[in-house]
Amino acid sequence: MNRFSKTQIYLHWITLLFVAITYAAMELRGWFPKGSSTYLLMRETHYNAGIFVWVLMFSRLIIKHRYSDPSIVPPPPAWQMKAASLMHIMLYITFLALPLLGIALMAYSGKSWSFLGFNVSPFVTPNSEIKALIKNIHETWANIGYFLIAAHAGAALFHHYIQKDNTLLRMMPRRK
């Protein structure tokens, strides 16, 4: 086996799409007046896409344990394999934790929010101090997420163009 399964490949790229939408919606939100319809659309898009990221990452975690990883040919040094393993752990933790922190942030704000058009009421007692702490963690960790994404993509490109192994090709969809 020299590639990940079709399911793993699909989930990888759809996760990237939803991560990009989540980040873009939050960044673009600031371009619009607070409370405007576009601002609110960007905010709701951020919430909804973030929850989809959690669902996708959780699904990927389950599926990852059903399949073995395809071999990298030629094999990289052991330290690179350890670094890759650590990077994947950090990516999974990040994109499983960020949506949960976002949900907690909304809950502690005391405001209702919408998920796919369904109203979600706060389920904890509002607390501005806890909200501020969670917001700080959420935003800091999201900024770290930018670095993790760049490092992950950079490593894949390094393996493809410099080391000339099949690291990147293992996760690419097949050409028809």
UniProtKB/Swiss-Prot annotation:
Q: Where in the cell is it found?
A: Cell inner membrane
* Topology within the bilayer: Multi-pass membrane protein
User: Which parts of the chain does the record assign to the membrane side Periplasmic?
Assistant: 29-45, 107-141
Q: What is its main location?
A: membrane
What GO cellular component is one of the record's annotations? plasma membrane
Q: Which residues lie on this side of the membrane: Cytoplasmic?
A: 1-7, 64-85, 163-176
Q: Please give one Gene Ontology molecular function term for this protein.
A: metal ion binding
Q: Which cofactors are required for activity?
A: heme b
Annotated binding of heme b 1, by residue: H12, H152
Q: Where does heme b 2 bind?
A: H46, H138
Please give the superkingdom of this protein's source. Bacteria
The transmembrane segments are 8-28, 46-63, 86-106, 142-162
Q: How is the cofactor bound?
A: Binds 2 heme b (iron-protoporphyrin IX) groups per molecule.
One GO term of the biological process aspect: respiratory electron transport chain
Query: Which keywords describe this protein according to UniProt?
Result: Cell inner membrane, Cell membrane, Electron transport, Heme, Iron, Membrane, Metal-binding, Transmembrane, Transmembrane helix, Transport
InterPro entries cross-referenced by the UniProt entry? Cyt_b561_bac/Ni-Hgenase, Cytochrome_b561_oxidase, Di-haem_cyt_TM
Write out the similarity annotation.
Belongs to the cytochrome b561 family.
- Its name, as the record gives it, is Cytochrome b561 homolog 1
Q: What is the protein's species of origin?
A: Escherichia coli (strain K12)
